[in-house]
């Protein structure tokens, strides 16, 4: 459908990074097929994430925690390592997605928040290490104005002011509009 709508070449590949899998081999297969099909890698975007949201920290199982850490943090780690030589060659870009959930400790999102905060840290390190190779590494940390964020602002105005800056548009996105 993307090929038809936008006139671009698409390469669908199933690749599950999870506990118990040979993740390095899974990721290398994706990289090899990508190079075979397109000849180069200019951009890596790490956005996939699964988690057991809604489960409290006290009730979280190791399997639920692993789901988030493997599908988010480990996936970003494996893909970044595998893409590094190609991105170095093309002076490419990495865009990793984190989340406001990690910034504010959303109830019921312990594994998701942990994975996303890990991705933010990994991204900072890569930006510092890979900048010398002309690889641009950034993290996108979406944050929408929600009732929970409003409650945080009211309960902790100093922390809110120190950590949440007004976007350039002058307002926050709203998940409903």
Name each model-derived stretch.
Residues 60, 105-113, 125:
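Active-site loop-to-helix junction immediately N-terminal to the catalytic Tyr of the SDR YXXXK motif
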Residues 55-57, 61-66, 160-163:
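Substrate-binding pocket helix/loop in short-chain dehydrogenase/reductase
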């Amino acid at each position: 459908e993307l090929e038809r709508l936008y006139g671009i070449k698409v390469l669908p590949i199933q690749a599950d990074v999870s506990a118990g899998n040979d993740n390095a081999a899974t990721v290398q297969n994706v990289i090899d097929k990508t190079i075979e099909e397109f000849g180069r890698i200019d951009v890596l975007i790490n956005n996939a994430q699964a988690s057991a949201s809604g489960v409290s920290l006290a009730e979280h199982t190791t399997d639920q925690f692993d789901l988030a850490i493997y599908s988010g943090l480990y996936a970003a780690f494996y893909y970044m390592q595998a893409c590094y030589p190609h991105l170095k060659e093309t002076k490419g870009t990495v865009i990793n997605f984190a989340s406001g959930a990690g910034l504010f400790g959303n109830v019921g999102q312990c594994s998701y928040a942990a994975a996303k905060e890990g991705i933010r840290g990994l991204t900072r390190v890569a930006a510092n290490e890979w900048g010398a190779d002309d690889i641009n590494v950034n993290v996108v940390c979406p944050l929408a104005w929600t009732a929970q964020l409003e409650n945080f602002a009211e309960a902790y105005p100093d922390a809110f002011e120190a950590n949440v800056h007004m976007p350039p548009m002058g307002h926050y996105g709203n998940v409903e509009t």
